[in-house]
C-alpha cells in the first residue's frame, strides 16, 4: 500500500518545496508515500475555452498514467467535500482497511483538473471554498495526510 500524491507542475518556491519534503518524510514514518509530479502544459497568453480544455486533457492523461485500475483516487477540487482532520483520518482508515493497492491524492495545476479526473476519482475533497496557490495547496494536503496518520497512530502532532 502506497499513498501517492500526484500533482501537476513542479513547485518553484523553495519554502513550499521544503515543507512538502518535510511532510513526506513524516508520512513515510507511518506509511510509504510517493510524490509524483507530472509536467504541466505551457499556457499561451491568449487562451480560449477550447485550448484550456486541451491543456487540462493533456495534463489529465499524464496523471492517469500514474494511477492503477484498482487504486482509490481522491481528487482535490473546490467543489469537493469539506471535512475535518478527524474525518479525513477516519476515511483514510476505511480506505486502508479496504485494501486498495494505492491511495492517490490528485492536485491539479493552475487550470484545475479535467473532467476525466473527476470521473475517475472515487472521492472529491476540498480543502476550502477559497482558492489557494498551487504550492500552498500541496503543502496543506501533505500536512493533512500526516495529521490523519498521526491521529490514527495516537501521535503527539494532533492535539
Swiss-Prot record:
It catalyses: pseudouridine(1915) in 23S rRNA + S-adenosyl-L-methionine = N(3)-methylpseudouridine(1915) in 23S rRNA + S-adenosyl-L-homocysteine + H(+). It is an enzyme of class 2 (transferase). InterPro entries: Alpha/beta_knot_MTases, RlmH-like, tRNA_m1G_MTases_N. The keyword rRNA processing applies. S-adenosyl-L-methionine binds at residues 76, 108, 127-132. Its EC number is 2.1.1.177. GO terms for molecular function: rRNA (pseudouridine-N3-)-methyltransferase activity. Pfam families: SPOUT_MTase. Its main location: cytoplasm. Belongs to the RNA methyltransferase RlmH family. This is Ribosomal RNA large subunit methyltransferase H. It comes from Ureaplasma urealyticum serovar 10 (strain ATCC 33699 / Western).
Amino acid at each position: 500500500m502506497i499513498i501517492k500524491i500526484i500533482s501537476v507542475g513542479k513547485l518553484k518556491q523553495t519554502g513550499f518545496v521544503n515543507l512538502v519534503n518535510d511532510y513526506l518524510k513524516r508520512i513515510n514514518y507511518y506509511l510509504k508515500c510517493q510524490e509524483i509530479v507530472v509536467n504541466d502544459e505551457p499556457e499561451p497568453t491568449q487562451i480560449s475555452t477550447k485550448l484550456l480544455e486541451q491543456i487540462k486533457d493533456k495534463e489529465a492523461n499524464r496523471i492517469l498514467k500514474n494511477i492503477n485500475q484498482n487504486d482509490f483516487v481522491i481528487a482535490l477540487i473546490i467543489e469537493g467535500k469539506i471535512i475535518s482532520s478527524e474525518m479525513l483520518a477516519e476515511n483514510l482508515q476505511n480506505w486502508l482497511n479496504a485494501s486498495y493497492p494505492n491511495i492517490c491524492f490528485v492536485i491539479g495545476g493552475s487550470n484545475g483538473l479535467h473532467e476525466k479526473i473527476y470521473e475517475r476519482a472515487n472521492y472529491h475533497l476540498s480543502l476550502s471554498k477559497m482558492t489557494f496557490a498551487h504550492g500552498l495547496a500541496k503543502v496543506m494536503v501533505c500536512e493533512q495526510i500526516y495529521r490523519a496518520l498521526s491521529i490514527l497512530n495516537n501521535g503527539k502532532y494532533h492535539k
